[in-house]
């Protein structure tokens, strides 16, 4: 008994140590709440709800795929005063981390397959399960499979995590596939470590999110390009398998402790990360993302990406642009204080952002085990950075409201820092090769909603941190968030 007590105590101390390693919050929850309220939906606690995926249905209901293998239908989740009624459509699945809906059928991505599920007799329960694809192997709990919403052509994209950070133990781990409606499995990319979601970006191009780890210095949003290599070479045995051969020859081995920008110049298939999320400052395990297509019902950020984070229980924003054939962009703080580790988000037509997840497996900031929440715009527009875009001599920064002209034109209100990471086989990376670019000119637009910053010292391949200092709106309001982070893969010509 004494040895058992010692073991349990050691486990508790280890868990506490892990929990202490969670990053700090931004400290902006009170300011954020004026603009976006968090509403907890009253779901029966006996459900032990662990959300893994969402899809908003044509009839106004919400479907939830759960980690416990259910597909639940929620009626009333999108009502102004939510009184949700939950029914079980399907059960007995395994970690439903992707859910789509098309022509009366669900497309569920679970650990071992993509399944098309339908209700033929109309009783509200699934009675037909069609295996669309199970070409990949499965040997370990870490081998998560994430699925996209159903695409306009009926396809589902699946990204497959490795057996662990350093191991490839089953077929096609670390690969991505396009699963067609007739069940074909088309290889798309390789080099994935541990994804957290896959979906189109705001421009309709397929992306996925990756967690920090070996060959990934920080969490990031990556372009899921056909034939692309996402960075982790442990998956290379998959190129010797029949479907892997369709991607062509395996890429060159990356050089350990190099830089991603340099290696992507040497290895044709290797793609730079489109948006780097600085570790702990902008999440620790980013997950689901969706573009805001609500047409302004969710505030001023329409057509931008909203990105959840499991560890810190936060939602962030991201914007992307293509420069010289390479995707890049920025990430921005948005809303902290969610109830648990976010694995799934979804917009409703009414302008709500539904969030849900779990706290099982790894430490999370949120303190609620089973919760379904939604973010609602209060109608009060926050004064915040709207978007940062790269320019040939600096950046163009826009805001959600007109700025005070004096503060907008003052170059001392803009501080920049650039850095990159080791591209290495070890876990994560410190921020390295730091520089301090200088804003030499700030040219406001005539309406006060944007400014062109001329910057001396831009560094291609670096993340550029922004601190916006004493900027004020035309009404004297400070920014809700004073930081943003742009990944500058290419300087526009």
Regions found by a protein language model. Give the residues of each.
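Blade-terminus and WD-like Trp-Asp/Gly-His loop motifs, strongest in beta-propeller folds
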Residues: 389, 443-447
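Structural beta-strand segments of beta-rich domains
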Residues: 393-397, 451
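Exposed aromatic-hydrophobic patches
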Residues: 452-456
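Extracellular interdomain linker/stem segments of modular secreted and single-pass surface proteins
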Residues: 378-381, 489-493
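Hydrophobic h-region of N-terminal signal peptides that target proteins for export
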Residues: 5-19
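Surface-exposed, short loops/turns at beta-strand junctions within beta-sandwich domains
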Residues: 457-462
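Short, surface-exposed alpha-helix to beta-strand junction/turn motifs within ectodomains of secreted
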Residues: 396-441, 466-473, 482-487
């Amino acid at each position: 008994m004494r040895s058992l007590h010692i073991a349990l105590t050691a486990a508790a101390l280890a868990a506490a140590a892990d929990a202490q390693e969670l990053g700090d919050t931004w400290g902006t929850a009170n300011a954020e709440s004026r603009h976006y309220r968090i509403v907890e939906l009253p779901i029966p606690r006996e459900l032990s709800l662990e959300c893994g995926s969402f899809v908003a249905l044509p009839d106004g209901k919400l479907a939830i795929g759960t980690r416990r293998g259910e597909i639940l239908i929620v009626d009333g989740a999108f009502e102004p005063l939510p009184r949700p009624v939950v029914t079980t459509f399907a059960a007995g699945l395994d970690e439903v981390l992707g859910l789509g809906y098309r022509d009366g059928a669900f497309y569920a991505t679970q650990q071992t397959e993509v399944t098309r599920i339908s209700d033929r007799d109309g009783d509200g329960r699934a009675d037909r399960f069609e295996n669309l694809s199970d070409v990949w192997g499965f040997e370990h709990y870490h081998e998560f499979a994430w699925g996209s919403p159903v695409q306009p052509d009926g396809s589902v994209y699946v990204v497959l995590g490795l057996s662990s950070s350093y191991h490839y133990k089953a077929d096609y781990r670390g690969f991505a596939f396009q699963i067609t409606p007739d069940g074909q499995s088309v290889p798309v990319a390789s080099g994935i470590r541990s994804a957290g979601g896959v979906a189109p970006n705001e421009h309709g191009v397929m992306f996925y999110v990756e967690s920090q780890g070996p060959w990934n210095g920080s969490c990031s949003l990556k372009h899921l390009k056909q034939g692309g290599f996402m960075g982790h070479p442990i998956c290379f045995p998959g190129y010797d398998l029949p479907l892997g051969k369709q991607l062509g020859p395996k890429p060159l081995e990356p050089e350990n402790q190099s830089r991603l920008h340099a290696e992507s110049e040497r290895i044709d298939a290797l793609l730079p990360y489109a948006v780097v999320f600085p570790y702990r400052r902008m999440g620790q395990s980013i997950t689901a993302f969706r573009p805001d297509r609500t047409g302004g019902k969710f505030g001023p950020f329409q057509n931008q990406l909203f990105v959840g984070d499991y560890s810190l229980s936060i939602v962030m924003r991201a914007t992307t642009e293509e420069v010289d054939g390479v995707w890049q962009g920025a990430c921005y703080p948005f809303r902290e204080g969610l109830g648990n580790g976010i694995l799934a988000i979804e917009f409703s037509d009414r302008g709500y952002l539904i969030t849900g997840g779990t706290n099982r497996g790894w430490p999370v900031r949120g303190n609620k085990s089973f919760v379904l929440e939604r973010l609602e715009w209060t109608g009060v527009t926050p004064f915040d950075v709207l978007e940062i875009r790269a320019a040939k001599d600096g950046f163009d920064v826009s805001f959600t409201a007109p700025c005070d002209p004096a503060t907008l034109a003052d170059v001392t209100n803009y501080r920049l820092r650039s850095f990159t990471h080791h591209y290495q086989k070890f876990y994560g990376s410190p921020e390295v090769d730091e520089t301090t670019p200088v804003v030499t000119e700030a040219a406001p637009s005539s309406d006060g909603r944007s400014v062109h910053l001329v910057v001396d010292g831009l560094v291609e391949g670096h993340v550029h941190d922004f601190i916006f200092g004493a900027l004020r709106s035309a009404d004297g309001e400070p920014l809700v968030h004073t930081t943003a982070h742009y990944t500058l893969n290419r300087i526009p010509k």
